[in-house]
Amino acid sequence: MKNILKILVVAIISLLVVGCKEEYSLNYILHQTDNLSIYEIEGKKYVETTEATNYVKLDVDKYGILIAELYPEIAPITVKNFKELISKNFYNNFIFHRVIKDFMIQTGDPNGDGTGGSSEEIKGEFSANGVINDLSHVRGTLSMARRGAVPETEETLNSASSQFFIVHADSTYLDGNYAAFGSVIHGMDVVDIIANVSTDSYDKPVIDQILNNITFVKEYTGGEI
């Protein structure tokens, strides 16, 4: 009888272990259940979804994840374009091709050198282009990269497509000239790591810093895992 009880206890424990596995990365815990992958970061839990929500997960190779919130009420054209690219799995296996400590880290170029983008350019949503945008370029802000010129032209003001940057340290002098559209709400430690890597004379990291993908997420509202 005792042996039977021992076997039952072991079987129950095994089921519990199989039912919910935990993996630890640099800045998050991955809870694996039978049908869900739950990402816990800074006390919040998120699950991936095919729904185009206003929350996205940036999976950075070796370092962990960032969770960012998008603001369609501030930059509707920019957010719509960003969501469409995510839905097409556009942002898979890109590098952060431009990194400047205390300024920003930039990605989203399929060429990996700052010359490329997606097939469609969008209207620049910022005051220099006649659009109100009150999201400031403070630490953690997501904003669209674009071509520049002196003087600016209609072409350069509306040249953003897929490249974007994450502000490392407050850079409010960019306000009014670039389309800010979101903010990192969890995972700025990953931005700090990338911002401090060695770069060459073109501000490109000596060792590739890889963005594995960007996916939509939503807050996990289930019970205890």
Model regions and ranges:
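Cyclophilin-like peptidyl-prolyl cis-trans isomerases
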Residues: G19-I225
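Sec-dependent signal peptide recognition
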Residues: N3-V10
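Hydrophobic h-region of N-terminal signal peptides that target proteins for export
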Residues: A11-G19
